[in-house]
């Protein structure tokens, strides 16, 4: 999917500029673009809008659980399911630093929602009982989950073990010990 190919983070000042940047990235053969919740609004909503103006590029959401505490992982999983359906299965979900046990717990809850359609946890960070996710994502098992290491952060091996892919900067070598894990190199902006 993203093995040693280029992706881009989009930090555009307007929705029109964001759409133009995504269209240009797709035309240039870039594998993926990523948006973050910020001044333009919610990243999932923005990416869903970008899916209407693009057709092949993967559309990634970057989320930071420490700065978005209102977004419970079961809510995020449902939002990502809807986005995956709207985008035709072109969605990605990337978790950004700081990393903690809460991120692993969030990934486990998202995956349960996507794979079983229901999630329950008595974990310390996100206790929940009977959260339901219907319909299921277009992509079996749900969107791929990335760990964003583009700032040079070292991730816990347990976190790397639950990720589908890693986002690393083109400025730095790939971390050691990642056999079998997909890498998506991101050009710094």
Where are these regions (language model features)?
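Active-site-adjacent structural elements that line small-molecule/cofactor binding pockets in enzymes
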Residues: 1-189
